[in-house]
């Protein structure tokens, strides 16, 4: 809920107090970063590392780039989240959150200077949209009912690991109730009290097909068992909760969680340890013979006793997990090794999986640094495996991470175009910092430095580490030639040398008390991650592979595929514009533009204008601009401060190149700083509006004596009728289905607060009092209809009897009955469906004959609703509104379609209430006059059996 500090920075004062000033700089940051976009962000946010192993080093900076790409701003409610995929998937929580790798995200992101990214992200899972209700379905985990428990998730442990770096324990102790709830949630769904163990289905460990699940009757969603994963996760979370309870002063609660952890550790050791490895145990109590890489996870949480170290000999065993691009996810000696692994995703029975490699390396670092010495694994094993992991992350010689890699061949095997690129499902940065370079964060005012780097290395360095709010740096320079600041191993805090040794070693350094300074919340009023409602984006010209909406989707990265950009590639214009419509006016003071430059057909503009639209519809340059940089610069974000701020409902960037070539934008943002003391909201959660009518809205303001002002969409009017009470009038020619918002603004010397009230149209048949056709099928009027055939399919047998129209068929049949009238709304009451598959569908809408129609549909078999539009027999998907809305008809429900404002809107009535299902922008393909000439119609399509309706009504205003 803040602006990305390196994009360039919002409010200079906020930047200075928000992160420690780097006191030592011996590394060439620009050279290390290379040609990465938005270098200022990295300077403000990441530790800089130098090591002799260039594969490890280059992958380190690449993985910071992929992490930055995964940062997604969702809006003022949830702020920032960390995404797994760069594009959306159908099984995610709101805005694309997936908790499977959220623990990895928290460990990786804990090294960021700006804490607000992970503050928001933790709140998203603990109390925000990520903690919200989830369908308990087979596809989304039938055992759990909220998104934060969709997949196994070591939430509390990761939150504490992050606080060990930031030093901000108050943030977590303030959230103890939510953290307890997250931990306890697994007890309610996945705990076997009789055995004292947690069970999980491998797929909900993010492991679809495994050696475990293949030994069940359902290799994909089967294989329930007591697994090293969730039991170790819950052990780690219990220990973390105990620490937090002690921080909060509740020793009794701490002892309770410590006790639960001890019992779980004992039960896990007894049931899952076979004397040499931790294994999956079926619900029936059978320990599988196969070793899986998940058997190393207990060390990630310090669960095993020292005597279990023998397991680590499997990591380097050629018949165990060793591989050229490993480790493997199942031991080679298993008969399930690589079973079907090359047949398609997602087989975790041998492929090299970054998710698991991350856990194994973190676990190995713990074994090496936090347990007694043993003979099964060494620091060299750690460095060798980290190097292997680094070189695995390559494609075509360039840094790259996807979903899974072949263990023995230099190729990614689960790597779908537009889906798997820069897959954020693992850690790497944390493994370099906390393992290789040995920065071991602590819960007290110390830091432990215990590098695992090879003794043969003559140098390594890390600087610009934000640790407990201080600047931490570590340098090793054997002969003093690498960094020019002397010989030996040094640790510096805030520029002061705290340790100097002849060689690297395991040292604990006292730290000054942690410094936690909150940075101000900032809100991007231009962001619309869901691409529904407002704000909206438009452009003078858009290349067919891009989208104006991409520039305001809350993401900012410069990949070719997938993309989050708008470009004017192919435009005939000498300059092009990208505009944002806020729906209702807001204050504009801080605009950021990230221009896209692919080094080819799309380049950084030579000049651009920032313009606002006046009330009369004319565009003019925004006054009072100060730009940084003064002119556009390749791969550098342009920041425009506007002083004094302006209030407008529309902004645009007009960009041009001297050679007339194409331009592009990956992010257009308008940041606003709220006053943290103030709250403004609407009493109404939403507002139904209708053209030509007035409605009343109420605002609520707390924390200030300042009054709210109202902003309404263009053409709408309002007047105050009492304190915090407003009458809003919608013009007669307005489109209420557009979802335009009403905005309340409160201005104080410390910021501007805003609240949005979405408006919508609510269908009510009573608003269409003229009944132009009403067939209740008490008499046979079939001869009055025109029968159309939108598809080359025969008509079903049609009959009217007993107040019901029945369509019967033995095979696929389809007919549309067009009424001899015109109207605005069509209402149909189904009586029954056939139960056939896949076609068991009702259609309603407008028909102009066999080859011309705009019909919405409900498919009873699939429980979905959508629209079809065709003219002259040609389909027009651009006019259908996409597919599909999920809905299930029950007896007594009615369907309606409304043809107004150039759209077909589909509605269902259930228990007397009408709900919008779908919107089709039909006039994108059918001219309004043509649409008006078509006839209201009802269609019936089925594969067999009978489908019936008991009323067909056409209404007009």
Task: Describe the predicted segments one by one.
Residues 20-95, 164, 169-171, 176-188, ...:
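Acidic/polar, glycine-enriched structural segments that form the non-catalytic walls/loops
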Residues 35, 95-207, 227-235, 288, ...:
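Aromatic-rich carbohydrate-recognition surfaces in CAZymes
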Residues 57-94, 112-145, 188-226, 266-352, ...:
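Extended glycan-interaction surfaces of carbohydrate-active proteins
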Residues 248-282, 310-469:
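Non-catalytic carbohydrate-binding regions of carbohydrate-active enzymes
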Residues 560-621, 636-677:
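Aromatic, loop-rich ligand-recognition surfaces of beta-strand-rich domains
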Residues 807-866:
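Secretory/extracellular carbohydrate-interaction modules
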Residues 871-896:
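Short, aromatic/His-centered strand-loop micro-motif at the edge of beta-sheets
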Residues 924-957:
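Ligand-recognition surfaces built from glycine- and aromatic
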């Amino acid at each position: 809920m803040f602006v990305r500090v390196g994009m360039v920075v919002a409010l200079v004062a906020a930047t200075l107090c928000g992160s420690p000033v780097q006191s030592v700089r011996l590394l060439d940051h620009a050279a290390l970063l290379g040609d990465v976009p938005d270098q200022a962000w990295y300077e403000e946010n990441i530790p800089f590392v130098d090591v002799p192993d260039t594969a490890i080093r280059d992958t380190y900076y690449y993985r910071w780039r992929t992490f930055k790409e995964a940062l997604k701003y969702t809006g003022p409610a949830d702020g920032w989240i960390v995404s797994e995929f760069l594009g959306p998937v159908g099984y995610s929580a709101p805005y694309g959150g997936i908790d499977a790798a959220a623990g990895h995200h928290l460990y990786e992101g804990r090294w960021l200077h700006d804490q607000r990214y992970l503050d928001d992200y933790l709140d998203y899972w603990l109390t925000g949209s990520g903690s919200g209700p989830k369908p308990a379905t087979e596809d989304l985990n039938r055992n759990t009912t909220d998104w934060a428990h969709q997949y196994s998730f070591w939430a509390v442990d990761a939150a504490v690991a992050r606080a060990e770096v930031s030093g901000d324990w108050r943030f977590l102790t303030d959230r103890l109730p939510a953290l307890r709830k997250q931990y306890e949630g697994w007890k309610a769904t996945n705990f076997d009290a009789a055995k004292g163990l947690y069970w999980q289905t491998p797929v909900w460990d993010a492991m679809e097909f495994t050696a475990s699940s293949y030994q069940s009757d359902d290799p994909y969603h089967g294989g329930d068992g007591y697994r090293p994963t969730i039991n170790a996760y819950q052990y780690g979370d219990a220990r973390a909760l105990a620490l937090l309870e002690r921080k909060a002063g509740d020793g009794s609660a701490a002892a309770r969680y410590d006790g639960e952890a001890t019992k779980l550790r004992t039960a896990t050791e007894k049931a899952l340890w076979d004397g040499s490895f931790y294994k999956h145990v079926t619900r029936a109590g059978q320990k599988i013979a196969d070793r899986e890489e998940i058997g190393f996870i207990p060390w990630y949480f310090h669960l095993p006793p020292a005597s279990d170290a023998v397991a680590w000999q499997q990591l380097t065993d050629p018949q165990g997990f060793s591989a050229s691009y490993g480790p493997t996810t199942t031991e080679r000696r298993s008969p399930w090794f690589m079973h079907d692994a090359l047949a398609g995703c997602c087989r975790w029975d041998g492929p090299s999986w970054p998710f698991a490699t991350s856990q194994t390396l973190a676990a190995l670092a713990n074994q090496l640094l936090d347990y007694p010495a043993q003979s099964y694994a060494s620091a060299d094993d750690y460095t060798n495996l980290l190097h292997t992991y680094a070189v695995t992350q390559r494609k075509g010689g360039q840094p790259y991470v996807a979903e899974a890699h072949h263990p023995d061949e230099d190729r990614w095997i689960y790597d779908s175009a537009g889906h798997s690129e820069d897959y954020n499902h693992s850690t790497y940065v944390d493994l370099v910092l906390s393992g290789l370079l040995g920065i071991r964060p602590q819960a007290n005012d110390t830091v432990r430095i215990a590098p695992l780097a090879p003794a043969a290395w003559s140098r390594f360095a890390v600087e610009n580490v934000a640790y407990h709010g201080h600047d931490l740096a570590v340098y090793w320079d054997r002969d003093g030639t690498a960094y020019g600041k002397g010989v030996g191993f040094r640790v510096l805090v805030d520029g002061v040398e705290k340790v100097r040794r002849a060689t690297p070693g395991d040292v604990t350094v006292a730290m000054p008390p942690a410094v936690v300074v909150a940075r101000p919340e900032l809100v991007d009023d231009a962001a619309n991650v869901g691409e529904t409602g407002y704000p909206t984006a438009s452009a003078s010209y858009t290349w067919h592979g891009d989208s104006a909406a991409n520039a305001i989707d809350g993401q900012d990265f410069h990949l070719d595929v997938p993309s989050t950009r708008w470009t004017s590639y192919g435009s005939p214009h000498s300059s092009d514009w990208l505009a944002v419509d806020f729906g209702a006016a807001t204050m504009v003071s801080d605009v950021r533009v990230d221009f896209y430059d692919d080094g080819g057909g799309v380049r950084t503009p030579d000049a651009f204008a920032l313009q606002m639209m006046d009330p009369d519809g004319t565009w003019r340059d925004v006054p009072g601009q100060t730009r940084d940089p003064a002119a556009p610069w390749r791969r550098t974000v342009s920041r425009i401060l506007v002083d004094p701020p302006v209030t407008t409902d529309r902004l645009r960037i007009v960009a041009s190149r001297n050679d007339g070539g194409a331009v592009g934008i990956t992010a257009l943002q308008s940041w606003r700083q709220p006053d943290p003391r103030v709250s403004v909201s609407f009493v109404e959660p939403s507002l139904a509006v209708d053209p030509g009518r007035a409605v009343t809205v109420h605002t609520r303001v707390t924390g200030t004596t300042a009054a709210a002002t109202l902003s309404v969409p263009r053409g709408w009017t309002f007047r105050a009728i009492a304190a915090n009470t407003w009458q809003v009038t919608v013009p007669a020619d307005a489109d209420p289905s557009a979802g335009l918002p009403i905005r309340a603004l409160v201005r104080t010397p410390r910021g501007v607060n805003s609240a949005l009230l979405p408006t919508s149209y609510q269908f009510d048949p009573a608003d269409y009092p003229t009944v132009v056709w009403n067939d209740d099928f008490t008499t046979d009027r079939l001869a009055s209809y025109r029968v159309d055939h939108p598809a080359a399919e025969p008509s079903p047998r049609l009959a009217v009897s007993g107040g019901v129209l029945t369509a019967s068929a033995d095979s696929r049949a389809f007919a549309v009955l067009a009424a001899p009238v015109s109207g605005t709304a069509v209402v149909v009451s189904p009586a029954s469906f056939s139960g056939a598959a896949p076609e068991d569908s009702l259609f309603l809408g407008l028909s102009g004959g066999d080859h011309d129609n705009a019909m919405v549909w409900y498919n009873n078999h699939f429980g979905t609703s959508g629209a079809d539009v065709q003219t002259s027999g040609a389909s027009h998907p651009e006019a259908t509104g996409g597919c599909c809305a999920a809905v299930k008809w029950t007896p007594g429900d009615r369907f309606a379609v409304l043809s107004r404002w150039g759209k077909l809107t589909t509605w269902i009535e259930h228990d007397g209430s009408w709900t919008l299902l779908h919107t089709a922008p039909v006039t994108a393909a059918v001219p309004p006059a043509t649409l008006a000439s078509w006839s209201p119609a009802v269609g019936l399509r089925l594969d067999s059996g009978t489908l019936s309706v008991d009323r067909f009504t056409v209404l007009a205003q």
